[in-house]
């Protein structure tokens, strides 16, 4: 059971290159507790990747690049080198005593962050998150909570949110459409904005089952 005073790092990243070797150009995060809410919130654009036109040409959401520049200009996001992003996140984790990191489909975020770390340091440093932080996965949690939920099942079938094998889908966008009652909600696919909805999914899952095991890797 996660104590309501336990600090949690919720993060999301956007990537370029290919799915097997993703490089992070956008990372947003919140540090929060269930009792106190948001303690820290930041949005970074990785200058080492974002300023490389060849790498960014393959970004799935490359059409958002002009908006990123506008956000950087108005202070909504901070353009910073990867080394400094990692350093600041580590300092925030230490300052607030972060125990868990969480993402929706956390295995991808973990792989993308570590792949970028190895690329940027030529594998001198291999892991992005500070040692000792445990990964939680809201995708795993949502599957446990919603797999037998009749209302969510009906919502998926009525809107054709199904896999090729006819099973319910559990993307953050679909889950949040159901949670919010907003059928036309579209995920931003920018780091910090996606963090905000994924935190609500996390809190919903814990409200349904406080003892849920959301760990990405289990002992």
Task: Outline where the language-model segments fall.
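Short, polar/flexible loop-turn hinges at active-site or ligand-entry regions and domain interfaces
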Residues: 71-76, 122-129, 182-188
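Substrate-recognition/cap helix-loop segment adjacent to the acidic, metal-dependent catalytic center
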Residues: 108-136
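Acidic, Mg2+-coordinating catalytic module of metal-dependent nucleases/exonucleases
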Residues: 100-107, 111-112, 154-219
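Short alpha-helix plus adjacent loop in nuclease-associated cores
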Residues: 136-163
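A short, structured active-site edge motif that brings together acidic residues
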Residues: 45-50, 128-146
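Conserved non-catalytic scaffold segment of RNase H-like nuclease domains
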Residues: 2-116
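Conserved protein kinase catalytic core
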Residues: 18-20, 143, 200
